[in-house]
Amino acid sequence: MKRILSCFVFLWGGLTLAAQEIYEFTVTNADGKSVAMSNYRGKVLLIVNTATRCGFTPQYKELEALYEQYAAQGLEILDFPCNQFGQQAPGTAAEIRQFCSANFDVRFPQFDKIDVNGPTAAPLFTYLKEQKGFAGFDLKEKAGQLLDSMLRKQD
């Protein structure tokens, strides 16, 4: 009984270790290195899943322009290629990064190719999909001020 109880406590403890906020995740960049999401604490994050062989691929140019304009103010665009939608992100992470660099001069962080749906979905994207929708931002915070300035320019 003591052994079973110990096992239960261990498993229960493991459940409490599940990420409760985005900064508890670790992801893999396009170079295959682990990156702690806590590195981005205090930044405004735009996390995108992308494909390099679809009708929306030219949006990389717009994402890069957004990054260039607001990176100094704390914007980080985190690009996670995904091949789950019509096999439109072929190649390795390194090949995808090379394509984006050569065609769109992308300089924002790019990460390993992942799945965003199903049983093989990356834990970060599973977490993101479980979150509530946008509820506004606090203009007293740097992130809120940046978002406010970006959205006002687009109105």
Question: Where do the PLM segments sit?
Answer:
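N-terminal "domain-start" segment that seeds a small globular fold
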Residues: L17-S38
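Extracytoplasmic/secreted proteins, especially bacterial periplasmic and envelope-associated proteins
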Residues: P58, E62-A65, G91, E95, ...
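Thiol/selenol-based redox catalytic cores and closely related redox-interacting motifs
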Residues: S101, D105-D155
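Sec-dependent N-terminal signal peptides
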Residues: I4-G13
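Amphipathic alpha-helical repeat scaffolds
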Residues: N29, N49-R53
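Thiol-based oxidoreductase modules, predominantly thioredoxin-like and allied folds used
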Residues: G74-G91, R107-G118
